[in-house]
Amino acid sequence: MELVLKDAQSALTVSETTFGRDFNEALVHQVVVAYAAGARQGTRAQKTRAEVTGSGKKPWRQKGTGRARSGSIKSPIWRSGGVTFAAKPQDHSQKVNKKMYRGALKSILSELVRQDRLIVVEKFSVEAPKTKLLAQKLKEMALEDVLIITGELDENLFLAARNLYKVDVRDAAAIDPVSLIAFDKVVMTADAVKQVEEMLA
């Protein structure tokens, strides 16, 4: 199959297995959920009644005081006591096979092509690391919410995009399923397309 280059009167021949396969919603969902789960920090920590600081002595005798019975100042009922079901550090990552991950990326890229959300260009760059230059370029292309993928990371482009809302710049090696579906449009250079094809082959 062929992808038309928007900035040139030509087309780029690409593999149908990467850019023309059926959309597997279940697979994409599973991989996106796993990717998001892996990004969770998981460092929350609370103390149980066994871990909080305090004496093990019974605060007052069982009977005769008129007060409610109590066995420990570390009881979860008490102020500064332990937490009943204390949260502990946790690894939320889920296992995803390479074949599944690649399949999900291919499925997303194919769907972007079908929905006309993938724009392929010969090259995409700015002369200097200036936000104004990139903003003007995107305005000319009628793009606002966009992910720009280049073959190698263009430092000028990366720096120019940092202060633009809903604009991100990645190199081909750094793409992930969440970023591909998060933006309204995806702009890829011809080099990036070839690199992604090789990566997912």
From Swiss-Prot:
Signal peptide: none
GO molecular function, one term: rRNA binding
UniProt entry tagged with the keyword Translocase: no
Keyword RNA-binding annotated: yes
Pfam families: Ribosomal_L4
Domain of life: Bacteria
Single GO cellular component term: ribonucleoprotein complex
Disordered, as annotated region: 44-71
GO biological-process terms attached to the record: translation
Keywords, comma-separated and alphabetical: Ribonucleoprotein, Ribosomal protein, RNA-binding, rRNA-binding
Subunit structure: Part of the 50S ribosomal subunit.
Function as written in the Swiss-Prot or TrEMBL entry: One of the primary rRNA binding proteins, this protein initially binds near the 5'-end of the 23S rRNA. It is important during the early stages of 50S assembly. It makes multiple contacts with different domains of the 23S rRNA in the assembled 50S subunit and ribosome. Forms part of the polypeptide exit tunnel.
Entry similarity comment: Belongs to the universal ribosomal protein uL4 family.
Protein name, per record: Large ribosomal subunit protein uL4
